[in-house]
């Protein structure tokens, strides 16, 4: 039973390990467990990977760590079996529409495509998992977990949403972001174009009820600033969940990715944290290292800094964002962004206040019952959509 598995206990090499959820975190964990000779079964209730996404472009951030994110993944045993286009520069805009060139001396992020199509992040990880012998079971709904397992079912509430369009275009490759509360309350709107395909979205941290208005304003803004013409636009949307878990364990099983709340609260980037949490969970199951200790050492400092940065960003408003853009545009953006995600006296002082202000978004809905076997807590049984 689930309660019989200690959180830091070694698992028999012959005992199958179940992973619930075939997102990036779950697949990364499965790949590393299989490479270590473990039998792995991934249970995914959708019929394919990437069902939450629609072929939209996203950024795999490359600023929170000292090392390049792809090097970090490769060293851990995750090959770059998906398309990852390095982005060194782009254009940012403030609330007045003034543009600022943003340039880094190393990739600011890697542009990846989300969904189940060829070359997407999810499909690349799936192909890699299958190649190392992972048993993938689609259309299999998990309502409880018994035996050694990892839970990776994704976000369970919407603390931020992104809504917009994916489309075809003749526009040249480009990357744009605008910080304007009229377009994206407490967030940002973005336009990413690569190889004749584009993604335009408003990423909102509040004002969800008026998302259609914010998206329409974002479209108009980028049409006026870049001459954008969208061909065959298709609407899409997504959401993210932020929190700091108590242990990121449930019933003796590691929780990884967005199910654990591992996402940057400032910018909403979560892929790097998700992949890293999958790597840490695999390590804990392979060598018996305590998973809670691992993620607290590698992810907790970043989560705390993200919360403090979010508090400061909200307090600064549009004018503060304008000043920040001015400073970043006159420096190496890679170094500036990396510095933003390092501990400082200010973020340490701000954190207790910020955590109190964001108490509800940071609430941990996981069950605290040691022997809990349910996949979805707060509190019910069933696999989340």
Residue ranges, per PLM feature:
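N-terminal Rossmann-fold NAD(P) dinucleotide-binding loop
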Residues: 26-27
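FAD/FMN-dependent oxidoreductases across multiple families
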Residues: 86, 211-295
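Active-site-proximal substrate-binding core of FAD-dependent oxidoreductases
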Residues: 245, 267, 283-323
């Amino acid at each position: 039973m689930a309660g019989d598995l200690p959180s830091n206990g070694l698992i028999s090499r012959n005992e199958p390990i179940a992973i619930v959820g075939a997102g990036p975190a779950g697949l990364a964990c499965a790949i590393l467990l299989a490479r270590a000779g473990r039998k792995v079964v991934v249970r995914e209730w959708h019929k394919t990977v990437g069902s939450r996404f629609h072929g939209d472009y996203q950024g795999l951030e490359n600023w929170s760590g000292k090392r390049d994110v792809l090097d970090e993944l490769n060293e851990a045993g995750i090959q770059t079996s998906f398309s990852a286009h390095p982005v060194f520069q782009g254009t940012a805009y403030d609330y007045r529409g003034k543009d600022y060139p943003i340039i880094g001396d190393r990739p600011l992020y890697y542009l990846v495509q989300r969904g189940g199509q060829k070359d997407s992040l999810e499909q690349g990880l799936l192909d890699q998992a299958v190649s190392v012998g992972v048993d993938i079971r689609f259309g299999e709904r998990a309502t409880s977990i018994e035996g050694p397992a990892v839970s990776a079912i994704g976000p369970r509430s919407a603390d931020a949403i992104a809504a917009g369009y994916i489309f075809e275009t003749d526009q040249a490759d480009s990357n744009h972001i605008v910080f304007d509360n009229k377009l994206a309350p407490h967030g940002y709107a973005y336009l990413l174009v690569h190889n004749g395909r584009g993604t335009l979205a408003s990423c909102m941290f509040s004002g969800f009820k008026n998302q259609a208005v914010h998206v329409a304003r974002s479209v108009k803004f980028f049409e006026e600033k870049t001459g954008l013409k969208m061909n065959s636009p298709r609407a899409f949307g997504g959401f993210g969940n932020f929190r700091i878990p108590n242990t990121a364990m449930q019933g003796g099983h590691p929780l990884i990715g967005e199910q654990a709340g591992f996402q940057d609260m400032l910018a909403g980037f979560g892929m790097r944290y998700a992949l890293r949490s999958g790597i840490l969970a695999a390590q804990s199951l392979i060598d018996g290292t305590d998973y809670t200790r691992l993620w607290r050492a590698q992810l907790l400092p970043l989560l705390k800094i993200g919360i403090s940065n979010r508090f400061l960003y909200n307090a600064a408003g549009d004018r503060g964002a304008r000043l920040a853009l001015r400073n970043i545009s006159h420096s190496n953006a890679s170094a500036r962004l990396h510095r933003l995600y390092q501990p400082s006296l200010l973020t340490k002082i701000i954190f207790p206040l910020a955590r109190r202000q964001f108490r509800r978004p940071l609430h941990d809905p996981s069950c605290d019952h040691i022997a809990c076997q349910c996949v979805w807590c707060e509190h019910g049984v069933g696999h989340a959509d």
